[in-house]
């Protein structure tokens, strides 16, 4: 954000068709990707996208970020000094129900407002422990209050690796989670599995349920 880079957050469920459409529209210069996830070789997909889209100058495996030396990279002489509240902070994606997901520009002020007041409405503070079980590339999990709202409130924030029911239950017990957000199907899976696992969930104070009818 500080240097003016505008992230485009793709969902783990996006395949080559969706990713190709997103890249053609956004024209990104970089592509940060996990190497493999749930048996899918995302690094190989990124290599194909880079070959088909010259705009992608660098493919960066997320697992190697901490070991990379960025000092040798060429940087523009004039760095983006300070973002304006009206500038685009992030490009989120539509649901893609009509085909390729569309890019939706969200300004800094928009996201700051969302994360602040969602966190306040959920009663989050520095004593909260927030579990982020689902992909943060979805707006709700990112700032409703989600990851950004949790950090804004000063809460301890725990990110699941795969978001399975057993991982969620274990994380709640291990980190004494106080608040989390799930979709109904995942919540039902957790309730069913808890009958077998019997984790200590006494710390849990609030569950947000998204997409419920």
Label each PLM-derived region with a short phrase.
Residues 11-12, 134-139:
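Conserved AMP-binding
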Residues 5-68:
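Structural core segment of the AMP-binding/adenylate-forming
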Residues 89-116:
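Conserved AMP-binding A3 loop
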Residues 88, 93-97, 130, 172, ...:
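Conserved S/T- and glycine-rich ATP-binding loop of Class I adenylate-forming
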Residues 112-129, 139-179, 192-193:
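Conserved AMP-binding/adenylation subdomain of ANL enzymes
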Residues 65-88, 115:
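Flexible, low-complexity linker/hinge segments
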Residues 1-8, 12-16, 25-30, 128-129, ...:
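A short helix-loop-beta submotif of the ANL/AMP-binding
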Residues 33-43, 163-164, 177-213:
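Adenylate-forming
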């Amino acid at each position: 954000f500080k240097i003016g880079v505008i992230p485009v957050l793709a969902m783990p469920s996006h395949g080559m068709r969706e990713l190709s459409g997103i890249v053609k529209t956004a024209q990104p210069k970089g592509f940060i990707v996990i190497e493999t996830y749930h048996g899918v070789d995302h690094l190989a997909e990124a290599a194909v996208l880079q070959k088909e889209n010259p705009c992608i100058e660098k493919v960066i495996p997320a697992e190697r970020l901490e070991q990379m030396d960025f000092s040798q990279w060429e940087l523009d002489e004039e760095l983006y000094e300070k973002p304006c509240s009206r500038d685009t902070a992030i490009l989120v994606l539509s649901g893609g129900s009509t085909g390729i997901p569309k890019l939706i520009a969200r300004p800094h002020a928009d996201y700051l407002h969302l994360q602040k007041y969602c966190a306040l409405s959920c009663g989050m503070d520095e004593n909260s422990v927030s579990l982020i079980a689902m992909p943060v590339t979805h707006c709700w999990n990112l700032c409703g209050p989600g990851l950004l709202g949790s950090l804004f409130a000063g809460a301890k924030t725990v990110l699941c690796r795969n978001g399975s029911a057993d991982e969620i239950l274990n994380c709640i017990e291990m980190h004494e989670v106080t608040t989390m957000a799930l979709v109904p199907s995942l919540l039902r899976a957790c309730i069913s599995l808890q009958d077998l696992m019997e984790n200590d969930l006494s710390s849990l104070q609030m569950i947000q349920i998204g997409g419920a009818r």
